[in-house]
Amino acid sequence: MAESHLDPSKLATGPAGFGAAAGQRPLAPLNAKIEVKNLNFFYNQFHALKNINLSIPEGKVTAFIGPSGCGKSTLLRTFNKMYALYPEQRAEGEIVMDGENLLQSKLDISLLRARIGMVFQKPTPFPMSIYDNIAFGVKMFERLTRSEMDDRVEWALTKAALWNEVKDKLSQSGYGLSGGQQQRLCIARGIAIRPEVLLLDEPCSALDPISTGRIEELIAELKSDYTVVIVTHNMQQAARCSDYTAYMYLGELIEFGETEKIFIKPARKETEDYITGRFG
């Protein structure tokens, strides 16, 4: 793939304050849940993210799109510091939530990931019962009675549109569920601890079209309670599910704005070329 020769000063910003050119600090919208300021990320010496400035709106679904290797999953994983286990990986800049720079925060990693939950590309149920898959994380942060835990498990499975399918087999292994059910189980597990933000990294890539449709319907419902950020290679999915879309290329944020505007009338030719299939 050819090297990018983009002029950062001409990056499109979308709605006022939601994005900014590299090296500039954006004005934070009043309802920003996460503010990314001059973020750079490195895998050893490889510069994977370059001066990212972005504000994630609260109570909305934001999609990251772009070709493979553009940095969208890397950006997603900086929000809850998934890189912290790997000393050769490092982030510089600011990721601010509730006035606190999460990159410099002394906040316990487990507590951070309770506030910012994550669902991965492939379903990852724990090797335990459906019930215990949901209860496991809750027990780490709350002391609930059995009755309270029963209510929480039912609540999470209901929110994930799975309760009616599993309510009579809660003691059975999560491995016995279909792929789509397992992914909804993982979403239920993620929201059971009541996070503020839910990160979804290609949550439908391994699923059939019917299961994908159910997950997309679920995403639309979840934004009433959570700020949702999704990485997807499926541009149609981004168009269907998200309120805001960020297009990335070679570690740079090229364009960010309301999804309808990004897909119907993008401000950058690079974005248009990618969305229309002329590139990527």
From Swiss-Prot:
Broad class of the protein's primary localization: membrane
Entries under Gene3D superfamilies matching the protein: P-loop containing nucleotide triphosphate hydrolases
Compartment(s) where it occurs, according to its Swiss-Prot or TrEMBL record: Cell inner membrane
Gene Ontology terms describing biological process: phosphate ion transmembrane transport
Pfam family, one: ABC_tran
Top EC class of this enzyme: translocase
Membrane topology, as annotated: Peripheral membrane protein
Binding site for ATP: G66, P67, S68, G69, C70, G71, K72, S73
Cystine connections: none
PROSITE patterns found in the cross-reference section: ABC_TRANSPORTER_1, ABC_TRANSPORTER_2, PSTB
Transmembrane segments annotated in the record for this chain: none
Organism superkingdom: Bacteria
EC numbers: 7.3.2.1
Keywords: ATP-binding, Cell inner membrane, Cell membrane, Membrane, Nucleotide-binding, Phosphate transport, Translocase, Transport
Protein's job: Part of the ABC transporter complex PstSACB involved in phosphate import. Responsible for energy coupling to the transport system.
Listed name of the protein: Phosphate import ATP-binding protein PstB
Organism: Burkholderia mallei (strain ATCC 23344)
Lineage: Bacteria, Pseudomonadati, Pseudomonadota, Betaproteobacteria, Burkholderiales
